[in-house]
Regions:
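Positively charged n-region of N-terminal signal peptides that target proteins for export
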Residues: 1-4
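Extracytoplasmic metal-acquisition and chelation regions
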Residues: 19-309
Length: 309
């Protein structure tokens, strides 16, 4: 099944004095949404390299310079990409930035308390422990996996770009409306694809799929790692192994950014099938306006294929 957002770009006359802002984005799904809103007017820059981990990334000097010089930075927030926070704080006061996690219209969910186990924190390093506490005592930052948030953000991005570039405000708005309609159609397709299998329990590599699961009513029985993909403790692995050995979990999913060895070890002898590798941030996809649809649609297809097998 292919999932494609068709973007009908509004045709507008060229305005001689229009100055399209340079836009920098943090992760592929945000980059895709901004690219759809900008359309033919400009191309946003993506910071997260292909195949990189959004939780643990280092900006190159050229990227830090791009952040410093950007007319607008659109990002999720420090809860997801703390490596971008310091670069943003170094920008001049009043420099334009749009943090999507903190946007009033963003639908948020908290990490489940079941995801925190005392053993995890007793056996991990101080640095990792601090990171786990930070990731799991607040809101789950994987907010783009709810397509409703994607639709809301398109409007926010268009408004912000229109404020910086009034001459092209109507184009940004038209592009955002077309893209939002595409996400709505995609959402209906995904819901129909997952409906026959949504009650079947699955386990994921890390706790990144709460928004996707809640939106589509999926039955996530647990995850190997916490929301920041830090190494799990022995007690956590033991509990999850017991869940798998009970025989109710049908599929366990690795991720493209992480070695599948631990998933294979956990699944061995349990009867749980190992599904295709999930890609919650789209790090394996070709960046561009179609990446958001490809991310959500591909995730749905991977889950459905394993549960139907």
């Amino acid at each position: 099944m292919r999932y494609i957002i068709t973007l009908a770009l509004a045709a507008t006359p060229t305005v001689a004095l229009a100055e399209v802002p340079t836009v920098v984005t943090d992760i592929p799904p945000v980059h895709a949404l901004v690219a759809q809103v900008m359309g033919d007017l400009g191309q946003p820059e993506l910071l997260l390299a292909k195949g990189a981990d959004e939780h643990d990334f280092q900006l190159r000097p050229s990227q830090a310079a791009a952040v410093a010089d950007a007319g607008l930075v659109v990002w999720i927030g420090p809860e997801l990409t703390p490596w971008l926070d310091s670069a943003l704080k170094a920008r001049p006061e009043g420099a334009a930035a749009l943090g999507l996690l903190d946007a009033e219209a963003t639908e948020l969910r908290a990490y489940g308390e079941v995801e925190k186990s005392p053993d995890d924190h007793a056996h991990e390093s101080h640095d990792t422990e601090e990171h786990d506490d930070h990731a799991h005592d607040g809101m789950d930052p994987h907010v783009w996996l709810d397509p409703g948030n994607g639709q809301v953000w398109l409007e926010l991005i268009a408004v912000r770009l229109g404020e910086l570039d009034p001459a092209n405000a109507a184009t940004y708005t038209a592009n955002a409306e077309a893209a939002a309609a595409g996400i709505a159609a995609l959402d209906s397709e995904i819901a129909a694809r997952l409906a026959p299998v949504k009650d079947k329990p699955v386990v994921t590599f890390h706790d990144a799929y709460g928004y996707f699961g809640a939106h589509y009513g999926l039955n996530f029985a647990g995850s190997i790692a916490l929301g920041d993909a830090a190494s799990p403790g022995a007690a956590r692995l033991s509990d999850l192994r017991a869940t798998l050995e009970a025989g109710e979990v049908l599929c366990i999913f690795p991720e493209v950014q992480h070695d599948p060895a631990l998933v294979e070890q956990m699944a061995e002898g349990t009867g749980a099938r190992i599904g295709g590798a999930l890609d919650p941030v789209g790090s394996s996809l070709e960046p561009g306006p179609g990446a958001y649809a490809a991310l959500l649609g591909g995730m749905a297809e991977t889950i459905a294929e394993c549960l139907e097998g």
